[in-house]
C-alpha cells in the first residue's frame, strides 16, 4: 500500500488538515471575540432574551403606572420584597432598552417601597446615568399617589409597619440588592 493520497504524501495531507483545522479554529475565535466586543452586543442579547421570554408563553409585564391588577399583599413581607426586586429589575431592563421614562416609574416605585430611600437613591445615582437618575427623581413626587392607588386601603393599614427592605448604609447592601447590582454588572 502506498503512502500517498491522490498523489500527495500522507504526512503532507495530515499537516495540511491540521493547519486548516487550526486556521478555522482561529477564525471562529477571532469573530466570536469581535461579536462579543461589539457595542450593540448586549442590547441584542437583551432583545433576544425578551423575544424568547415572550415566545415562551410568558405574558408581557405591564407597567405599574397602567394599573397592576396583581398588586402584592402589603402585609406579606415576601410578596412585597419580590415586588420590590421586580420593580428594580424591570426598571433597569427598561432603561437599558432605552425606555427611560417607563423604567424611571418602576425604579421610583422601588425607591418608595424601600425603607431606606436615600441609601437606595445613592446606589442608583452611582449605577444609573445622569439622565436616567434625573428621570427617576422627577418621578418620585407622583409615585406616592400611584402606589396608594395600586395598593388601595391595604397601604394605609400597613403604613405603620416597618419597611420590607432596609439598607442602613453601613457595609454592603442587602443580598437581594447586591444580586441585582451584580446581575446588571454582567450586562454592562
Swiss-Prot record:
Disrupted gene: phenotype observed: RNAi-mediated knockdown results in impaired mitochondrial homeostasis with the up-regulation of the mitochondrial unfolded protein chaperone hsp-6 and impaired daf-28/insulin secretion.
Keywords of this entry: Membrane, Mitochondrion, Mitochondrion outer membrane, Protein transport, Transmembrane, Transmembrane helix, Transport
Subcellular location: Mitochondrion outer membrane
Highest taxon of source: Eukaryota
Quaternary structure annotation from Swiss-Prot or TrEMBL: Forms part of the preprotein translocase complex of the outer mitochondrial membrane (TOM complex).
Entry's family note: Belongs to the Tom20 family.
Name of the protein in its database record: Mitochondrial import receptor subunit TOM20 homolog
Source organism phylogeny: Eukaryota, Metazoa, Ecdysozoa, Nematoda, Chromadorea
